[in-house]
């Protein structure tokens, strides 16, 4: 889980680099969708977001898309929800 060495996870790295997000939105899992979290930063680069998906189902959220410069960018990120 992400409680182990949180600084080494994707969310830990983003938190250390950018600080606490302005807003966090959580989507719980459903029968046809994995859980995911969006972190929004209103004051960085005119507003950026980071989308993390629990692709394994074990609470390990991975960064799959961001519109921030020099971060993972994948416009088709929603495929990871399946």
Positions of the model-derived regions?
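Residues within mature, well-folded domains
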Residues: 1-82
């Amino acid at each position: 889980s992400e409680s182990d060495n949180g600084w080494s996870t994707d969310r830990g790295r983003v938190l250390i680099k950018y600080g606490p997000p302005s807003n966090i939105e959580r989507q719980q899992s459903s029968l046809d969708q994995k859980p995911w979290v969006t972190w929004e930063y209103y004051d960085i680069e005119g507003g950026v977001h980071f989308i993390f998906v629990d692709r394994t189902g074990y609470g390990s959220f991975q960064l799959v898309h961001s519109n921030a410069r020099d971060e993972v960018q994948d416009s088709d990120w929603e495929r990871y929800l399946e």
